[in-house]
Amino acid sequence: MLRMRVRPPSAIPVFLIFVLLPFVLTSKPITPHYGPGHITSDWCGFGDSRSDCGNQHTPKSLDIPQELCPKFSSRTGSSMFISMHWNNDSDFNAFGYSNCGVEKVFYEGVNFSPYRNYTCYQEGSFGWVSNKVGFYSKLYSMASTSRCIKLINLDPPTNFTNYRNGTCTGNGGTAKMPDNPQLVIFNSVVKVSTQFVLPSSSDGFSCTKHLVPFCYIDGGCFEMSGVCYPFGYYYQSPSFYHAFYTNGTAGLHRYICDYLEMKPGVYNATTFGKFLIYPTKSYCMDTMNYTVPVQAVQSIWSENRQSDDAIGQACKSPYCIFYNKTKPYLAPNGADENHGDEEVRQMMQGLLVNSSCVSPQGSTPLALYSSEMIYTPNYGSCPQYYKLFETSSDENVDVTSSAYFVATWVLLVLVIILIFILISFCLSSY
């Protein structure tokens, strides 16, 4: 009679199963640090008093770690929007913003908000919020393919005669007309054309593109001395044309701006009649051969001042990552109620170290990937985050770090292989 010898299963595979399985089942994700971050040291920031170490109330006035001030181009009371449109005077604190970095963090904008209650004509302060959204949307988009940004002055035209500069009618006639673009009103209706030059470089900075404002006043013709004059003009070059014209019945006049990306070159600014604008400043930018989304942090006042959501509206995927505050602006340990917000200070801590990933969920120093792999095309969609599921919004509800994700699945595969080995071993014993 044949006897079947059954060998007992090896204790080693069973031991491995019981040792590895708990790791598979209990591995946990690493929570990213919510706020802006950077992958390399080649980064820069743009700000206001909350990142200006020249402020007399530093460090209590800061929302960033004090040691990061050299990384930021900042001025108390200013913003990139204010500096685009106005010169430095008693009404507006303009600043020559200039900075370079592959990665960019923007934390400014609050100094021009509905709290200022500015209106030039009848657009109201919220009409200027729309202009602000348009400006930052174009700025962020252009900056995502640029390393350097510099505000530059343009040479004024010299061939004008018999004209006066335009003025605002809002705020009882006390509102200061934007200096950029400059509006001029001629004494007579004549077709006038003047040239302006967008340079290809400025003080050692390469300018392969310029952010230029084109502003106009809508609402039909303008009544002057019993005559209603059409309102219109255009910018033109052999490869560029942008215009506005209206000759309808005079109505509600609003000051509206388009923000244009223009290449270096010589352009004509030409009037259709009595009014003309020409640019006096531009944001000069170079061009990178890849795209790195910029990062913008919500810039608001405390609850005692009226703010807007222009930064959030302007900062959109794929060219910008927006970090929204979850609480009102609160500064119990700051210089005043509008400087030293605790939440933003915590958000900005992520800028103190290089991270391996920057995403809408935040940044983390843990990753299995190099910076070269992240810049193109994964900056903003981090390789070390595994998307568990998508939602109808732009952000993922949950993410898991790849270190744990990869380890979990490797261990799971090993356990499955060991189970098959054990089964095969048992079957072969019969």
UniProtKB/Swiss-Prot annotation:
- Where are the stretches annotated Esterase domain second part? 275-390
Could you list this entry's UniProt keywords, alphabetically sorted.
Answer: Disulfide bond, Glycoprotein, Hemagglutinin, Host cell membrane, Host membrane, Hydrolase, Membrane, Signal, Transmembrane, Transmembrane helix, Viral envelope protein, Virion
Q: Which domain of life is it from?
A: Viruses
**Cross-referenced InterPro entries:** Capsid_hemagglutn, Hemagglutn-estrase_core, Hemagglutn-estrase_hemagglutn
* Record membrane topology: Single-pass type I membrane protein
Subcellular compartments? Virion membrane; Host cell membrane
Q: Which reaction does it catalyse?
A: N-acetyl-9-O-acetylneuraminate + H2O = N-acetylneuraminate + acetate + H(+); N-acetyl-4-O-acetylneuraminate + H2O = N-acetylneuraminate + acetate + H(+)
Q: Where is this region: Esterase domain first part?
A: 16-133
Q: Which protein family is it in?
A: Belongs to the influenza type C/coronaviruses hemagglutinin-esterase family.
Protein name per the record: Hemagglutinin-esterase
Q: Which species does the entry assign this protein to?
A: Porcine torovirus (strain P10) (PoTV)
